[in-house]
């Protein structure tokens, strides 16, 4: 045995702990690849009290992987699932007598990743409860704890830090939403999951990953593609908040007996509950939070609502967080290169068609309606003496209608699928774009949804986008919905 390994490593190699397989396991996880030389596999049995009754491992490859698997299995068995989820790479190396030799540190990383994949498998076996979002409680009977969504960025890291400093029992969770690109650090990509786990362990809190690929594909990605094919302009963040992120965090909180959920959004929760704008108006994210069900909003904490972004970064720097200077992601999380047209085209067939004006005169040709959205000016492929904008997309006839900016003017719209926090009669302002200015409005409920009269014209309103209503002072969100139709 090479002398560079310490006596505890050698002890685990000569006398491995918990080697083998759990029969009928609650969860199974693997990391690495035997074809590449190193692989670790964990199987575990979780009791009704969420304690790890049995933990077994198998490891193939270098001595560091085998010893790390043995040490981790011994550390994890008998702990609560949250206690085991708090074990860090440093804890494994300490159990092995100190840092592993240079070039062998990956042994602890692989072992830890295999265990966490077993946790992930355990939660996935909850199946219907996790994917359906049904039967979620209001958290009233839970402990003073919180499941904090952690994306790998500075906002979610500081969120978890602030909650811990306020005395909450904090459990971090990262959502595996899509496969992503190798090396990508977009929100919830594979590499981000590992980075978020390192950040959580650095804060001394447990970390779990929930595999939500199926749910995210069904409720967000397919809707995204289908909307463009139907001539609408979707907002995937709204769909995720409506059907995925908050439901999944509440699912985990319920299973762990914790009262609250938290995210790094810049918003506040007021009495009612109602959604309120944050301290930092430039970072206001209430526009994408309107679909959160009131029963979930009532148990949600937004710690960053009382801070400005500059203060959040300063807190991260003062506490020595590695994410302090992480750049913000401006792209759709599952399209990190920003090329949504290529993404949609890979998933739906789009036929060529005509570009016409409002009178039906043909001005040019296009390669597919999925390339266009209302308000678009660039990429039309036609020349004109004055600027032209997309004013309508007609998927059935495969026509893209263009016109002057004035033809984008909208004074009425129909909103469907509304979610209300306050009495709709309190709605005095409406915002139709993420960074748009709210304008005065009047609402009237009809058989097909909410008819909205805009007291000031708005340009470029796109079906499929959100209409979010605010109180007269603009401070509180009354509710929101999806724009189904717009009229001049």
Curated annotation (Swiss-Prot):
Residues 283-285, 433-434 are annotated as: Interaction with tRNA. The record marks 265, 465 as: Interaction with tRNA. CDD domains: IscU_like, MnmA_TRMU-like. InterPro entries: MnmA-like, MnmA-like_C, MnmA-like_central, MnmA-like_central_sf, NIF_FeS_clus_asmbl_NifU_N, Rossmann-like_a/b/a_fold. Its EC number is 2.8.1.13. The keyword Chloroplast does not apply. It catalyses: S-sulfanyl-L-cysteinyl-[protein] + uridine(34) in tRNA + AH2 + ATP = 2-thiouridine(34) in tRNA + L-cysteinyl-[protein] + A + AMP + diphosphate + H(+). GO terms for cellular component: cytoplasm. The active site is at residues 240, 333. It is found in: Cytoplasm. Keywords: ATP-binding, Cytoplasm, Disulfide bond, Multifunctional enzyme, Nucleotide-binding, RNA-binding, Transferase, tRNA processing, tRNA-binding. Residues 143-488 are annotated as: tRNA-specific 2-thiouridylase MnmA. Residues 1-130 are annotated as: NifU-like protein. ATP binds at residues 149-156, 175, 264. Pfam families: NifU_N, tRNA_Me_trans, tRNA_Me_trans_C, tRNA_Me_trans_M. It is an enzyme of class 2 (transferase). GO terms for molecular function: ATP binding; iron ion binding; iron-sulfur cluster binding; tRNA binding; tRNA-uridine 2-sulfurtransferase activity. Disulfide bonds join 240-333. GO terms for biological process: iron-sulfur cluster assembly; tRNA wobble position uridine thiolation. It comes from the Bacteria. In the N-terminal section; belongs to the NifU family. In the C-terminal section; belongs to the MnmA/TRMU family. May be involved in the formation or repair of [Fe-S] clusters present in iron-sulfur proteins. This is Bifunctional protein NifU/MnmA. It comes from Rubrobacter xylanophilus (strain DSM 9941 / JCM 11954 / NBRC 16129 / PRD-1). The lineage of its organism: Bacteria, Bacillati, Actinomycetota, Rubrobacteria, Rubrobacterales. The gene is nifU/mnmA.
């Amino acid at each position: 045995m090479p002398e560079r390994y310490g006596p505890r490593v050698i002890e685990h190699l000569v006398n491995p702990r918990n080697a083998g397989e759990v029969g009928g396991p609650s969860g199974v996880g693997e990391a690495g690849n035997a074809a590449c030389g190193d692989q670790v596999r964990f199987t575990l049995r979780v009791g009704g009290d969420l304690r790890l009754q049995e933990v077994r491992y198998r490891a193939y490859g270098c001595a560091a992987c085998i010893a790390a698997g043995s040490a981790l299995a011994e550390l994890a068995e008998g702990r609560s699932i949250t206690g085991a989820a708090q074990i860090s790479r440093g804890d494994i190396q300490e159990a092995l007598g100190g840092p592993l030799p240079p070039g062998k540190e990956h042994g602890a990383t692989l072992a830890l990743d295999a265990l966490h994949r077993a946790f992930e498998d355990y939660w996935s076996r909850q199946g219907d409860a996790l994917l359906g979002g049904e039967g979620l409680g209001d958290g009233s009977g839970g402990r003073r704890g919180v499941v904090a969504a952690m994306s790998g960025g500075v906002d979610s890291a500081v969120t978890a830090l602030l909650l811990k400093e306020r005395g909450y029992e904090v459990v971090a969770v990262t959502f595996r939403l899509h496969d992503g690109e190798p090396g990508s650090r977009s929100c919830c990509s594979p590499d981000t999951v590992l980075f978020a786990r390192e950040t959580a362990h650095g804060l001394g809190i447990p970390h779990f990953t929930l595999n939500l690929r199926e749910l995210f594909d069904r409720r967000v990605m397919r809707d995204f593609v289908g909307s463009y094919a139907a001539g609408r302009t979707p907002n995937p963040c709204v769909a995720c908040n409506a059907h995925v992120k908050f439901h999944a965090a509440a699912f985990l909180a319920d299973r762990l007996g914790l009262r609250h959920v938290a995210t790094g959004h810049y918003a506040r929760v007021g009495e009612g509950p109602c959604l309120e704008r944050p301290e930092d108006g430039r970072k206001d994210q209430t526009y994408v939070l309107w679909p959160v069900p009131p029963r979930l909003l009532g148990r949600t904490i937004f710690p960053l609502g009382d801070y400005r972004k500059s203060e959040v970064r300063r807190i991260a720097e003062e506490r020595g967080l590695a994410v302090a200077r992480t750049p913000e992601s401006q792209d759709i999380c599952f399209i990190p290169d920003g090329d949504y047209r290529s993404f949609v085209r890979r998933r739906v067939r789009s036929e060529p068609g005509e570009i016409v004006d409002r009178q039906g005169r043909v001005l040019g040709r296009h390669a597919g309606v999925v390339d266009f959205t209302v308000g678009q000016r660039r990429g039309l492929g036609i020349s004109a003496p004055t600027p032209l904008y997309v004013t309508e997309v007609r998927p059935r006839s495969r026509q893209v209608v263009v016109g002057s900016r004035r033809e984008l003017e909208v004074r009425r719209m129909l909103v469907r699928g509304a979610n209300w926090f306050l009495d709709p009669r309190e709605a005095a302002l409406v915002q139709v774009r993420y960074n748009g200015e709210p304008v005065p409005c009047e609402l009237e409920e009809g058989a097909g949804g909410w008819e909205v009269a805009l007291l000031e014209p708005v340009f470029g309103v796109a079906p499929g986008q959100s209409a979010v209503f605010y109180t007269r002072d603009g401070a509180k969100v009354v509710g929101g919905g999806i724009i189904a139709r717009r009229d001049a």
